[in-house]
Amino acid sequence: MKSCITISLVEEARGGPFIFWDGLEDGCRRAAALGFDAVEVFPPGAGAVDAGQLRALLDEHQLQLAAVGTGAGWVKHRLTLTSPDSQDRERGGAYVREIIDLAGPLGASAIIGSMQGSHGGPVDRETALGYLGEALQELGEYARQHAVPLIYEPLNRYETNLCCTMADGVQLLDGLGENPNVVLLADLFHMNIEETCLAEAIRAGGRHIGHVHF
């Protein structure tokens, strides 16, 4: 297990649940000074990050890259994997694939959180979960070329109405077939809202949990 801390590069998310906001160089320097093993980076998009510069900063500060978030896909670009518009869903998938291609060569995974979207309007719950499952399966397979899993994060009820608990996440992943290359992110903020017992929820997540947010 390695400890990590977050660096957000997304101005539209300023004030959100991230620690460092003043660029990669500042974030990596401060993460190393605090003794963390790794950083999580949340960029506006893959093109906003110079992979060579990021690798050099990680090497300079003896850090690893734990994950790269895709949240700006929704926050900045209004893309989800469950949109009623098939072209929007494809654009969402393409955005995530670019993040995977940024993170994967550095040994890191992409995180799917807010880009999972919600059901409503012309898309009922079953259809939305079908879209989400298809996307996770395809993107997990895409990530396999980099020998990293895709990370999927259940969110609280105020951010999605699809998967809000560890049990929901397990059910979704179990429906993806054998060895889908997708793991769960157990985020204690969301879990504190949705779970009746954190310990039981973590046990329910079990082998599916591959990443934790405190």
Give a label for each model feature.
Residues 9-11, 43-45, 71-72, 116-118, ...:
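Active-site-proximal loop/turn and secondary-structure-junction residues that shape catalytic pockets
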Residues 55, 195-214:
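A short alpha/beta connector and helix-capping loop motif
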Residues 22, 60, 79-183, 193-195:
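Active-site acidic/histidine proton-transfer and metal-coordination neighborhood
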Residues 50, 163, 197-200:
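Alpha-helical transmembrane segments and their juxtamembrane interfaces
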Residues 14-16, 193-196:
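A short, acidic/glycine-rich surface segment
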Residues 28, 184-186:
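Short, compositionally biased strand/turn segments
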Residues 40, 67-69, 111-112, 151, ...:
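Conserved beta-strand positions in the central sheet of alpha/beta enzyme cores
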Residues 1-104, 137, 179, 207:
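N-terminal pre-domain/capping segments
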